[in-house]
Amino acid sequence: MSQASKHVGWCLRKAQKDIAECEKLGKKPKHRGLMKVESDMEEAKRHIAKAEHNLIIAEYLINGGFTDASVGNIFYTMYQCFLSIATKFGYDTGNQTCTLALMEYLKEQGKINLDDKFFKYFKYEDEGDGKGRKKK
């Protein structure tokens, strides 16, 4: 079993625990993992529309000389694309780490074709120094 597969399993269990805890406390169901849901192409399209919007803003900032300010929009452009893929395949994701694990898992399963370089942009080094620096 791959690391991505294990992580997806953990994320699915986490969401179940979170939902059960909310129900126990009488709160609105909310989770920080992954839930298997029905595929929703309309929602997937909305994520793509958000990605396109973020990309337009990033290009505007870059053209205006604000490359540093564009980084967040570029990140969320990619992330919204990942959310669209998750939605297409019938997953509701509650955090970025689970979203990334799902993308890696779907790639391993041959369901998506995505260059590994996109995964590294979202990962952090574990150097034990607590700084959470991006991998190079």
Give the location of each predicted region:
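Terminal alpha-helical segments
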Residues: 1-136
